Every structure is written in C-alpha cells, then in structure tokens.
From Swiss-Prot:
NCBIfam families: rexB_recomb (TIGR02774)
A Pfam family reported for this protein in Swiss-Prot or TrEMBL: PDDEXK_1
Designated name of the protein: ATP-dependent helicase/deoxyribonuclease subunit B
Species name: Streptococcus sanguinis (strain SK36)
Keywords: ATP-binding, DNA damage, DNA repair, DNA-binding, Exonuclease, Helicase, Hydrolase, Nuclease, Nucleotide-binding
Bilayer-spanning residue ranges: none
Gene3D superfamilies in the record: P-loop containing nucleotide triphosphate hydrolases
Family per similarity comment: Belongs to the helicase family. AddB/RexB type 2 subfamily.
Cofactor(s) for this UniProt protein: Mg(2+)
Its job: The heterodimer acts as both an ATP-dependent DNA helicase and an ATP-dependent, dual-direction single-stranded exonuclease. Recognizes the chi site generating a DNA molecule suitable for the initiation of homologous recombination. This subunit has 5' -> 3' nuclease activity but not helicase activity.
Assembly and interaction partners: Heterodimer of AddA and RexB.
EC id: 3.1.-.-
Coiled coil spans: none
EC top class, as a word: hydrolase
Amino acid sequence: MKLLYTDIRHSLTKVLVAEAESLVAAGKRVFYIAPNSLSFEKERSVLECLKTQASFAITVTRFAQMARYFVLNDVRQGQSLDDIGLGMLIYRTLTELDDGELKVYSRIKKDPQFIQQLMDLYHELQTAQMSFADLEFLEEPEKREDLVKIFTAVTAALNKGDFDSSSQIAAFAQHILAGDTDEELADLALVIDGFTRFSAEEEYLVGLLHRKGVEIVIGTYASQKAYRAAFREGNLYQASVDFLRKLAEDYQVKPDYIPHAEAEDAFGRISKILESRYDFSESTVSLSESDRSQLQIWATMNQKEELEYVAKSIRQRVHEGVRYKDIRLLLGDVEAYQLQLKTIFDQYQIPYYLGRSESMAQHPLVQFVESLERLKRYNFQLEDLLNLLKTGLYGDLTQEELDHFEQYLRFADIKGAGKLAKDFTANSQGKFDLDCLNHIRRRVMTPLQDFFKSRSQTASGLLAKFTEFVQAARLSDNLTALLQGESQQEQERHEEVWKAFSHVLEQFAQVFADSKVKLDDFLALVLSGMLLSNYRTVPATVDVVKVQSYDLIEPLAAPYVYAIGLTQERFPKIAQNKSLLSDEDRARLNDATDSQAELQIASSENLKKNRYTALSLMNSATKELVLSAPALVNEVEDSMSTYLLELTAAPLSLPIIVKKPQASSDDIGSYRALLSQIIELHQEEIDREWTAEEQTFWAVAVRVLRKKLAAEGISIPHISKELKTETLQSETLQALYPQEQPLRLSASALNEYFRHQYAYFLKYVLRLQEEWTIHPDARSHGIFLHRIFEKVLQDDSSADFDRRLAQAMEETSREAEFESIYSESGQTRFARQLLLDTARATGRVLAHPSGIETIGEETGFGSASTPFLTLENGRAVTVSGKVDRIDRLTKTESLGVVDYKSGDIKFSFEKFFNGLNSQLPTYLAAIEELADYQEDKGTFGAMYLQMTDPIVALKDTKTLADAVSQSMKPLQYKGLFVADAVKELGPLYEKNKTNLLSQEDLDLLLAYNAYLYKKAAEGILSGHFAVNPYTENGRSIAPYVEQFKAITGFEANLHLGQARQLEKLDASKFDRRPTGDKLRQAWLEKMREEMEK
C-alpha cells in the first residue's frame, strides 16, 4: 500500500493518474476509485490527465461498482431485491405483525416515512459491518425489542422468499474470503482518490484486498505542516490528516508527501493564511491587490438578484472567450435555488447541467396512480376524481365532456362513492343535460366501481384485476397519444416512467407472490414505489455550466467558480441525525461491537468535515472565485457565513462587494436579459446620474432591441394609463335592442350601470354568470324568508300571529324547493335554523300592523304597453321589477311599499343623486301603475325592513326595558316617507327628518329618478361602456365595485383618473355641515340644477 498527500493547490488527480499509468505499465489492471458523488466528474478529469488520452486498463468507478464487476456473473441464490422491493417486503412484514407485538412503533408501522427509516437503517447496518443481532446492545429495552423483532422478521421473510438484498461489496468480500477471486486479484491494483474517510464496509474491503496482495494507492490533500502537527484539533486539514494517520497506523505505511514545482498562486497564499489562523501559528505570507482580485465576496438582496448577477458575469466571460464548461456554479441550498435557477439561466440563455436526480412525481402516470390511491382511501372526493380525469390517461372523454362533467360535479357538490353511483337528478332551471351527464358518469364510474369491488386477494389475482382496469381505462392508448408531437427527449422520459411503473408491479408480484393483499395496500405500495423513482440525469452537451451543491466540490474543479447562497444557516451545513438510532445509540453500538464495525456519528464529524469542505471551496477555482451571500433566502432573513466574514479580516482584508442594479453595459447578457434589464430599470429609480456615454449606450441598446423584437414579430405588452373600450357596432345594437321593442331596465340594472358601466356590459349585455351551485346562498336565503312572510300575511285565519308564523315556517321548510337545499347537510340545516330565528324576530314587526293592511305581496310592475319613459328619439323605456309588499293605511287609503333586506340598508340622497340608490324612488313611481292606486289618496312612503335577529350588548343597557328597546331598533321600517302621512305611522317607522318629503319634494325626486333612467338608457343604446368604477374618497376603489379586474385590467395606482368621482355637496356654501331638512333641501336643489343643465 502507498499513501500519498500533497498541497491543496497541486492536482492530486494528476499525481494519482501518474501512479495509475505506472501500475498499468507494470501489467496491472487498475480501478481508479472515487466517491459516489464525484465518480462521473472524476472520469473526465482522469481522461484529461492521461498521457495517452485513453486506457483500457484503467477503470474509473466507485467501490460498489467495482465489486459488481467481480460478482456480475455470479449465480445468485436468491432473487435480487432493490430498494422498492425491499420497502414492499418490510411493509408486508410489518402488516403481518400484530399491533401488540410492537410496543413503540405499533401505531406508525404502516407509515411510509417509518418504512423508509427502517430501510435506511437496514442499509446503514450493512455498510457499518454490523448484524441485526448487534441491536441487542441498545439501551432502551422497548425500542431494542421492537427493532430486533422487525429485522428478525424481515430476515426471515428474505430467507423464506429466497430474496437477496445484500450489497455488492459484501458479496465481493465473501468471494475474496473464499479465495474465488485470487487469480483475478493477482493483477489488480487500486488507486483511491477524493476520500477523507471510509465506511466500515469500504474499510473492510480495502483490508481484505491488501491482505491478498493487491497494490493500493490512496491519495488526499494535506499540508506538511498539518501532517506533522502534534495537535490537530481545529486544523483545516484535520479530516484528511486523521484519515492518513489511521491508514498509516493500520497498515504500517509511512505517507509520502508529493511536492510540486509550480509557483504558489493567490489561492495557495490565502489557504496558508487561513491554516495559520486555525492552528494558531504565525504567518509571514502576505497578499497583493492582484491576489485579492481573484477572490470576490458579493452581498446581494435576495437569491433572484444573486442569480442574475451570476448570469450576467457568466455571459460576460463567455463574450471574452471562456467556455461554459470552464465555469462551475455551487449552490448553498439546491432546493431553494432550483426553480429560479432555471428561470434566470433560460432568460440569459445559459446552458447548464444540475447533477441531481429529478423525481417522476409530476408525470401524468404517477398522478394517475396517486389519484386512484386517494379515491380509494378517501371514498371518491371530488378533487381526486377530477385529478384522475385531468391526467388525460383515464377513459376517452373529450375536453368539452370533461368541462361539462366538472361543472356539474361542482354545481351539485357531488362527493363520495354513493352519490357518484346514482343517476344525477339535481338541476337548476334545466341548465344541465342530465341524460348526457349520466352517460358520462357511467363511462367514468363503471371501470372504477368494478376495480374497487376487489377484496383482499392474492397478488397475482389483484394484478390481473388491475390489468383489466387499465385496459378498460385505455391507459396504454392514452399514453401513446401523449407521446404524439413530443421531442425525442420527452419521449425517452415517458419511456422511463413506463419502465419504472412496470418494475414496481414486477417487484410487487415478486415480493407478495401468493400472499393476500388489500386493494388499499396495493395502491399505496405502487404509489410509494413510483414516488421513489427518478429520471436519469445526463447532460445534453459537454459545453455546459455544471451546477452542484457546494459540499460536493473538490479542489481545482474549474477555472471559474461561483458559490452562492453561502449564508450562516447554509454554510457550513450541520448534518442532523434523523434516523431511528440517536447519536447516543450509535456510540453505544460502536463501543460494544467489533473494531471493524462502525456506525457513522454525524455530529462528531461535523466540525472537521465542514472545515475541510470550506478549504476545498476556497480552492475550487484555478483562476477566479466568487463567494456570494444574499440577505434574504425564500423571503427569510439570513446573515453572511462566518467563513466569508473571516476572509474580510486582516491580513486577508478582502472587501465585500455590495451588488446593486446599475445601468451598465456589463450587465447585458442576452436579448432576453436586455429586455428584462430595461423593464426593471424603467420601473425602479437609478441611484446615480448617468454619464453622457451611458445615456447614449442605453439609447442605442433600446433601438437595437426594438429592431430585434420587430424582426422576430414580438410586441411588448404594456400597461396603459388609459383603459379604452370598443363601441358596439350598429348591427350588434340592433340585435341586442331592436328598434321596435322598448329598452328594458330595472332598479338593479340602473345601479350597476352607474356603479361601473363596463360591469353592466359584462352582466347585462354579455350576461356573464357566477358559477352555479346547489348550496343555499344569499339569494336563496332571501327567497326562503320572503316565502314565510308571504304565507303569514296571506293567512286570513283567526289564529294568533305566532301560530300563523310557526305554521308558515313549517310549510315553507317542507316545500320541495327548500327541503332539498336545506336538508342536505348539517351545515345547511344550521343555516335554516338561523333563518327561522330571523323570521321569528322579524315577525314581531309584522305582528303589530297598527293601522296598516297588506294588499299585495311579490307584486310585479312594468310592461311594454305602459313605458316608464320615452326618449327624445321616441324610443320607449320600460322599468320592471317586483315589490315585496304593498301596504295601505286604513285611515287615509294611501299606499306604501316595503322591501325586505337582509342587511342594514338606508336611503342616501348622495348615493341616489349619483345613481346608486334608486330602488325606493322606482317603487314609488311603480305604485302609480297599480289598480289600487288612487291619485287623490297618494302614497305614504317606500321603505326597507331589515330581516335580522338583533343582538344587544347588555353592557350597553341599564335595564331590561332598555334591552328590549335596543333590540327593536334594527326592526324598524326605514326609508322615504311623505310628511303629511307620518302622523298615521306608529313607532315601528323611523321618522328621520332628512327623509320626510313634501308632495313637491316627492315629485322632484321621481322626476330626477326618471332623469337617471333616461341618462342610463341613452348611454346603453349608444353602445359605449367605459371602464369607470366609482370611487367614494378619490383615493381607492372598493372591492365590491371593481370585481372584474382580471377582465378590465384596472389598477388603482394607474387608472384612478378614469374612476367616476361621486358628486358631493359644495361645503363652501354652508356654514356648517347640513343635517335634517337642510340636507334634504340641499340635495333636492342640486337635483333641480342637474336636470336644468
């Protein structure tokens, strides 16, 4: 055995390749061993260092792969199980154990994460050269008994099923011990590169090979100073020196230091200064400004900016002649950066390769399996069924059929297998074609129902049922259709997923064989196997930027290296133990077992491993290195790593470069990046004055960009400060509003028009509707209460009011229309109870009419024969609607209108003037059309009655009488009243002076109401509908006013100037704010002025 070490700025690979070539010259077959994470990259490095550029006698590989070469042709006694099969076997073993047999893990024995932890521990014990019997040394008795029992059962299941899940290294070691490979080992040599520790299994294999006379060369990085130091704790090279010293002691070999003749560079000098700092020795090394320029420390605001600066720098280097393959990007947190990395590098057109396995979880086939599993587990929840259909792999539904089916399922809130098994019957005014929908339902549900009827049966029987199901679901045909038009790369990915799917089913058949399995367990196991599957990751070309986690880097990896995301939380990485064995358990097992057996204790390795990783990172570049840390990662604040801050302290004294957006030509990376940069700079303020040269540069850059976009046929969408709408053409207007027919309006349509013209266009012209639902909403609640009061008031029996009310509530609740929607669930039954409480409370008002008689309920008004008004061009306008209740004063026979409201609504002159509150005036005008109306008797008012169950805070009352009085206040009639009739009205009517009208006032009010309808009608017939939501305060738009932002694109910060400002009283005309009569008169005068314009 030969042990070598060299300085970190001297290529160890070159040294070891030279050793390998000399071994080949001596007739040896050389295995060049690298760690798992570096083997692919190391193969390229070795080829670059070979004098002949290639060699059939040198194989670059990993320990496990090397072992596979020697056992590949073995006739293995058992069937081979991979991790998917092993996980299934563990699952099967745990289900066969009774709950009472496990004291600690009984409740989680089917949990996928627990099974994964057991599988990890299984492999870890193999790697550590320990047997399951060694778990007897655990201190906690219950945990010890459970783990021993589980692994004993797993071992028995492996033996019974003739399965083999042993590692390749263990199998190779058995051959070495048996002497089966002595002839092959005679010409074997090992060169081991990149290790600072061996696992117990690797160490055992190296020992066996050494004893068989195999020549072994092991190399690592270390300084002579560190190796000779008596005290190594805290040294940067502690990990590699401890590794060397242990090997030297075990094999009685003195490590050889390999000097190098190259001149020391900036990174070498920085490394020596850092080494002296950590071993508390004096350093005479100094840095020049040229040295400091080769290592930069960046500080950025967030990871997006950080990636953009890196991308711009890469493009600049490529412009200067650097190849992408000469650039390495290291990430402090791959998960946090992965999505934005793709977005920004695609924007800057930088090819890259992220050497990380990609899960198949988002593939439609995996989602198909997941939806099946969830449908069975959760009994056909709506979203699970829709997800299955939307994979495109189930059935033969067209997109139109799927849309209609989904719309109905959401309307009727179909959940559960019971509802889906029955024909659909719920409908809304015949809007759904139930025959067509039930035909779709049968096509969807028949294969699922047949498959889910499967009870516990053997694995072979279950797989046969599953095969029938996927054939009925046309899975194969749908997958074939999915491949149409796809690129070669995408087709290969689909093929990988299908192979993984087939492999999971094969492993299931192999593991469970004749065992009985429940359908739920089968689907869960197949899903688990699919989620464990990953795509192969191979770079498409050689000339790409390689991206990897910083802790996988080795010295001298690339000429230019960018390491980003180096915050305190991520650099250094603190390995955490998440296994079933705690650090204390591991230490106890290590002490109790053979010296060759050892479980890794992450916490004890953290410090020296992280120091060595930091040193490797500092020496990863051969020319220039950039270390960067953002202030925010995933919107969470973090600080710069202490390793980076150490570089800023004397004598290194490296400056921290704070990166900010600047209008610099250095920031240009590509046309896409230029476009992004111009938009970003346009939206943000520039923090310095531009020079004339910079202004000229950016002016030219914008012109070039515009020409490029024009050549590509690309236009830049922009947010205009003015939203314009197209006027409807005359043909369209004629189709919508024929000349020979009157224009039909209503109080709610008028309100919508003056609230926002374009909203009127969407609702009343295009007739857009909200998504239908079978569940009761505000509209159905209102109809329910209206029906109760209608029945009460129409009941002429001599029974007292409370009895009549109770009977009306009972009859209304039993009506088919309401029984179907208010009896469906506990939630709807609770809503009905609240409505009945409201009816009882509001009924107290109806019980005391006090000189009032009701002569009509739900009375309609407005017809083509009697137009509401006629426009100047002779066009008739009708206003239609329905009045909830018409009352008559028994003494004067004047009429009044009552409108039931669920909210506390009051008449406002300001809103009425602006067209936003015309309901009551419209009702007053409508009374004059009624047969019961007598002009000489007139009207006494129009009012709202709030349907509510009042709540009174007792802390605001002094006596019980006060509480009763307070509870009746919300239950008053509130609205407009004719002053002469007020004396006939009781205490249930709110007599606000502002709303008491003389006959002259009433006539003016009705005239202005007609003026509003005329103004709206002329605007509607013109065919122009502006985007002009109203604003009350001139600063913002209420959400209920602008509900169509996604359609109109209205943004308050850009388009507030288009909003309609509400007209208000001129405060300068009054000494103080008017109230009562003065307020009414002021608004009436303003109406008169408006109509006279």
